[in-house]
């Protein structure tokens, strides 16, 4: 059993899925992703997750060795990073009360925001959450991990290590794609 599975087992031991809500076919899954959320997805959040590329709210089908396999919505997993992200941020704007690390203020929350990666010409990636405060011109980019870090991490591709792809503070006013925001 992998470390990730051991941690997930421990989570279930301390907070089991109620029998009426468990997915009888899949260990570590609710029968419905809605049961894994603290509150229902609002219209904007549901639309964002439905338009995302990760099948967070819908089952997927694929053929494996000639057999049709249906996988549940990813948010139905007790180890779902997207469910964790939504449970932390919810439907309403997020408020940061202190300015110890991030500027205090109220931030609009967008889930599955598409943003281009450092490799030119690639398809945009879906960011788990994007928080923006137009008044202070501040953006917070959130890529959340629940238990993924317990698996076998792969090395970063060379493109991610090339500093030429990254924004530098002194370029902020010369046409950077995010020049409307303060980055940190």
Tell me what each language-model feature is:
Residues 129, 145-155:
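A short, conserved, highly charged catalytic patch centered on acidic carboxylates
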Residues 130-141:
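Active-site beta-strand-loop-beta-strand hairpin of nuclease catalytic cores
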């Amino acid at each position: 059993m992998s470390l990730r599975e051991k941690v997930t087992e421990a989570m279930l031991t301390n907070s089991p899925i109620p029998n009426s809500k468990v997915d009888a076919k899949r260990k570590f899954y609710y029968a419905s992703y809605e049961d894994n959320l603290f509150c229902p997805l609002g219209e904007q959040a549901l639309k964002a997750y439905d338009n995302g590329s990760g099948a967070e709210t819908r089952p997927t089908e694929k053929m494996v060795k000639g057999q049709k396999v249906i996988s549940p919505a990813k948010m139905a997993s007790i180890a779902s990073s997207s469910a964790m992200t939504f449970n932390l941020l919810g439907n309403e704007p997020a408020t940061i009360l202190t300015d110890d690390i991030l500027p205090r203020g109220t931030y609009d929350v967008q889930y599955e925001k598409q943003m281009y990666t450092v490799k030119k010409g690639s398809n945009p990636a879906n960011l788990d959450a994007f928080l923006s405060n137009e008044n202070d011109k501040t953006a917070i980019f959130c890529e959340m991990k629940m238990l993924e870090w317990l698996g076998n991490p792969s090395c970063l591709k060379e493109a991610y290590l090339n500093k030429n792809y990254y924004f530098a503070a002194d370029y902020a006013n010369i046409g950077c794609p995010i020049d409307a925001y303060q980055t940190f």
